[in-house]
Amino acid sequence: MFIGQTRFSLFVPQSGSWRASNGKKLSSEADYRAYLYDPQRMEFRTNHFIEHTVPLLAQAARGHEVTHIVSFSESLPQRWKSRLEEAGQQYDFLWLDERKDGEQAWDTPQAVIRASGHTGVYGSYRLDDDDMLATGFFDAAQPYLAEPFVGMFVSFPLGVEAIFDGTHFSNFRLAHVPMNSMGLMALCSIDAEKNIRAPKGGPHDLTDRYSPVILDARHVSYLRSLHDGQDNAMRYQDGSVLERLLHETGKNPPLHDYDQLASAFPTVAARIDQGAQEFAVGEAVGEGVGFALAEQGARGVADVTIVLSLNSEEPIGPEHFVVYLLVVDAQGRKLPRHQAVAGLKSIKRGRIGHCHLMPVKEGQSRVVVSLHLEQGQSLQGFCVKGLEPKAQKVSLETVSVAADAAFHSVDAARFAALVDHTPLRVQDRVHDLLVDRWDSIRAVATRVLGQQRAEWALAKLRLLYRRIRRLASR
């Protein structure tokens, strides 16, 4: 048996946790209440919980005995209580737990397990209203419901992080975070006299200081939705939350296996597919199959998810298969290769700048390229390319583009022309040229001038290079 709990915007002004996470922006109980029950915040979280968190729990619970507690305060506005009550009627595994203001509700899981009549081992987990557990979560946890593991925790560190704006999911990254809060499970037991044995707990990221912790990262087990309304993001400066999140998650590898994403989180895949443009291609990628904004002169898109259906006779390594992304700044100027873009790589090969490099499986597969660009940056087009002969033989069956602007397909030559005609500042062009040709410049200088004079000349060139970098950063 599994007992879970979501503490749904509980009003607990005496709690130290909200004070620690809000960056001292909320100085009074009235400020806290206004923040907690802000209509925009509640709409976002309630929609996420009812449209994603709960339906995924329902799928994961098939074949398992699961009770999921939703604890909320009596002061929760009726509008949101009604939404929870409707969900409780639709999903019989939900246990609605209304508490007096100020109550933490930490004792509810033990009260529920005692009332259930269950005896033996059970798992007790927690889940925030803006996170999700994968459809295979309880299948993965079931083997640990055994007597030898009682008194331990099991943590499932492998998951996905994604930006969510209330409508679109984007920027999917693989994350490995031991003892994260998503589904951290205490392995407990209860006997016929209602006596409970449970591991000693503490702050989730310090769980192993209190009790033994089993780590199982064999499967993707959770999706963490990142958004500018996160409670623990209040410490950031106003307007910088998403930028911080992009740079933090950009350190993690992108998730490219769309079939894995769709299997673990079907509600997220359905949201991506909803309203996406579909292109039937049915040809080898060759030296490039391009896509550009359909409306000439239109502003690019900052949030886009691209799904490619591929068919390959053999597996292709990520260094040989690329989706080149034409990213521009607020003035419509091409971003130079030397300029870092959160979550994207930049390579010199084949006149390619910012991109996603990805592996291709043998046979049929679907891969996803998803990005959420920083403020002032946008995508004008993209090109799917093979960087070696066997990669160029990969068949691109279909392309799906989920974005707030229309795209149309173009051949490799037209995409190259689009790249060439997108303006690039002179200092950026010189900078890219120096970076690209530095090794050959060094070799020629050494051959013509000799080692000592070449080093002197290159030192002068480095000074020029630094000045150009300063100009390029303005």
Residue ranges and their predicted role:
Residues 120-132:
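Short beta-strand-to-loop acidic/aromatic patch adjacent to the donor-nucleotide binding site
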Residues 65-75, 97-99:
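Short beta-strand/loop segment that forms part of the nucleotide-sugar
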Residues 5-8, 12-15, 189-324, 329-332, ...:
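C-terminal catalytic/acceptor-binding lobe
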Residues 30-39, 80-122:
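Active-site-proximal specificity loops/subdomain of glycosyltransferases
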Residues 1-52:
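N-proximal low-complexity "stem/linker" segments adjacent to membrane-targeting elements
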Residues 102-117, 134-213:
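Conserved catalytic core of nucleotide-sugar-dependent glycosyltransferases
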Residues 54-65:
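Short, acidic, metal-binding catalytic loop of nucleotide-sugar glycosyltransferases
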Residues 406-474:
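Membrane-proximal basic amphipathic "stem/tether" segments
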